[in-house]
Amino acid sequence: MGPSNEHSSGHRNNFDLLRLFAACQVMFSHAWNWLHLGDPLNGTWVFDLLFSAPGVAIFFLISGFLVTDSYIRSSSAASFFVKRSLRIFPALFVNIAVMELALLVTGGLNVTGILQYLFYFTVYILTAARIWAVYFTYEPYTMSGFYGASDPSGVLWTLTVELTFYLTLPMLLEIWRRWKRAGALVVAVAALGSWVMAQHFNITDKYNPFLSVTAGPTFWIFSMGVLARLYWHRVSKIFEGKLLWWLATHLAITWWVAGTSAAFISINNAAPVDAFRIAVLAGLVLSAAHSLPRPNLLRRQDLSYGIYLYHMLVMHTLIAIGWVGHWWLWIVEPVGTVALAALSWALIEQPAMKLRTSLVARRLSVA
């Protein structure tokens, strides 16, 4: 998951609402499995609806659209990377620091040397990938203590993927800027190659812990948003004001596959039926973003990133205490997560975004 705050069409869209929906879908789907809250509902229409719109896929789709828009409107690649960095890293730094501190005070972290650990921590922050930090430095975790062998997060891999999207996209868009048709073809070919790679992982049942957290096997989802933004002037009529049509199509397909193995959309397997359903979901997301826009409904309070960052820390804390399977966890988990997300927004994310706005304005005034 990667947060975005640039909006096309003068901010007249529902992307903030959709990111919040995606974050909540991820939180509730994890509560369903990890806290065993959904066990009585497995195989029901509630299961089919919840898992028919995977939040991670929605994040990637929205990110493809908005990050492409951000790059196109940026004065330079450096400006683009500064904006992205100020949106991603401040909240990520605090989130990882909180988790590491929680592990340290509960016996799950063994700091054998300050410099060695600082190197590890730096790699962890810059990549959002604990597995990469461990590989390039050392293993500081005891796999014991309050949290046991569990990673208090476990969701940051999507940010690692998102960061590789940010590194890949400028190269593709520079080709598109110079040669429109060739650039679009390159994006499409890259998307096809990404889908083939994901299919290879699925068919061979092989999981590469390093390649799997890059743009490689998931760029095909991100590219749907990229191509939609590049050709929005041509395709917008397919989506704007067509929310009911796209929703009806999505629900009809969900009903058709209900009760089968295809009811659960997996972005990791990328089977043809999953790819088709994600393409339909992309249409639904783009239509929902540009139908009946309510840009001020959230009053410019974007909690989606914080919910994504902290929901698993709250969940693993509940599991470590021994609270699983209780109906009231449907309340405790979201309330605890939203409280932390609100703090993250007010104390970290919003000030960082104001700094970003100030830096961009200062650069424009100098220019």
UniProtKB/Swiss-Prot annotation:
- Entry annotated with the keyword Transit peptide: no
InterPro entries given in the database record: Acyl_transf_3_dom (IPR002656), Acyltransferase_3 (IPR050879)
Source domain of life is Bacteria
What exactly does this protein do?
A: Not known. NodX allows Rhizobium leguminosarum biovar viciae strain TOM to nodulate Afghanistan peas.
Q: Could you confirm whether the keyword Cell membrane appears in this record?
A: yes
Primary subcellular site in the record, as a coarse category? membrane
What does the record say about its membrane topology?
Multi-pass membrane protein
Sorted alphabetically, the Gene Ontology cellular component annotations on this record are:
plasma membrane
- Positions of transmembrane segments: 15-37, 46-66, 88-108, 109-129, 155-175, 183-203, 208-228, 245-265, 270-290, 312-332, 335-355
- Keywords (A to Z) from UniProt: Acyltransferase, Cell membrane, Membrane, Nodulation, Plasmid, Transferase, Transmembrane, Transmembrane helix
What other remark does the UniProt record contain for this protein? NodX probably forms part of a complex with membrane proteins specified by other genes in the nodABCIJX operon.
A Pfam family reported for this protein in Swiss-Prot or TrEMBL: Acyl_transf_3
Q: Tell me its family.
A: Belongs to the acyltransferase 3 family.
Lineage of producing organism: Bacteria, Pseudomonadati, Pseudomonadota, Alphaproteobacteria, Hyphomicrobiales
**In which compartments does the protein localize?**
Cell membrane
**Per the UniProt entry, what are the Gene Ontology biological process annotations, in alphabetical order?**
lipopolysaccharide biosynthetic process
* Molecular function terms from GO: acyltransferase activity, transferring groups other than amino-acyl groups
> What protein name is recorded for this chain?
Nodulation protein 10
Q: Which PANTHER family match?
A: ACETYLTRANSFERASE (PTHR23028), ACYL_TRANSF_3 DOMAIN-CONTAINING PROTEIN (PTHR23028:SF53)
The species is: Rhizobium leguminosarum bv. viciae
